[in-house]
């Protein structure tokens, strides 16, 4: 009987819907883990259509030396600092802390190691799925090094 109850409880728990807060935070983590580990193909899956060309451009700047340096240092680690969803549940923002990260500068392709940085991600709801809107960065403090 305990096995039946265990299966029943597990089934009920797994059927519960994630809250919008949990959804946006998990989407942000999944995106950042892919983005800061140069896995732009996966990052595109979590991105708006308007972000695709920017991610393709970044992917074209990744060379074998970048991948080797990433492999030597290890994967970037991502955590959520804060998140906010607008009242109508159509837009959100998540501030992530990324540790052990490499940043490739779009102009020139120079790679820089950053022990810790924050990235503010803008999310929009498209067809009932949260997606990251990541376009060419502005010099407005949206991405800041600690």
Model-derived features: where do they sit?
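Sec-dependent bacterial lipoprotein signal peptides
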Residues: 1-13
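Short beta-strand or tight-loop elements
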Residues: 8, 76-79, 117-119
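Short, low-complexity N-terminal intrinsically disordered segments enriched in polar/charged residues
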Residues: 13-37, 45
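Intrinsically disordered, low-complexity segments enriched in polar/charged residues with Gly/Pro
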Residues: 20-21, 69-72, 107-111
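Short solvent-exposed beta->alpha transition segments
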Residues: 25, 40-102
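Exposed beta-sheet edge and beta->alpha loop/turn motif
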Residues: 85-146
């Amino acid at each position: 009987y305990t096995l039946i109850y265990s299966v029943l409880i597990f089934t009920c728990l797994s059927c519960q819907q994630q809250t919008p807060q949990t959804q946006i935070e998990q989407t942000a983590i999944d995106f950042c883990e892919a983005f800061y580990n140069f896995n732009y193909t996966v990052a595109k899956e979590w991105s708006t259509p308007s972000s695709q060309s920017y991610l393709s451009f970044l992917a074209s700047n990744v060379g074998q030396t970048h991948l080797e340096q990433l492999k030597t240092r290890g994967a970037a680690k991502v955590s959520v600092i804060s998140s906010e969803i607008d009242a109508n549940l159509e837009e959100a923002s998540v501030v992530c802390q990324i540790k052990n990260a490499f940043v490739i500068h779009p102009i020139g392709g120079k790679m820089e190691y950053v022990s810790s940085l924050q990235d503010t991600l803008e999310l929009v709801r498209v067809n009932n799925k949260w997606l990251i809107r990541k376009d060419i960065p502005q010099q407005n403090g949206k991405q800041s090094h600690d």
